[in-house]
Amino acid sequence: MITALSYLGVRSDKTDDWRAFAGLNLGMQVLDRGGKNTAFRMDNQAQRLIVSDEPGDTLAYLGWEVAQKEDMDILAAKLEAAGHKVVQANKALANRRYVEDLIYCHDPAGN
């Protein structure tokens, strides 16, 4: 099923603070993705933390890792059975997240 928290995204207009915190305090490599996003990595993954320069300081999304496609399908079915609408993301979104495939749903708080 889920093997790891792969990445997380936040909305914040305090990108300089995030650069200092993640870069200096956590030792993450800063990756300028252009546009409104700044990404950070700490290992061989393309990105682990993505900060979108938007008003507020809120969680935008979490990216969960699964071992195989079948696990993602099982997870989607469980979420649907629990009343959460699951959406198959398009390839453009998957590419922006540096993943092969992607589904998403909203949590009770709307994230």
Region locations from a protein language model:
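Vicinal oxygen chelate
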Residues: 4-13, 54-80, 82-111
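Core segments of cupin and vicinal oxygen chelate
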Residues: 7-47
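Short acidic/glycine-enriched loop/turn segments that link adjacent beta-strands
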Residues: 34-37, 58, 96-99
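Active-site beta-strand termini and strand-to-loop segments that position acidic
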Residues: 40-45, 53-54, 105-108
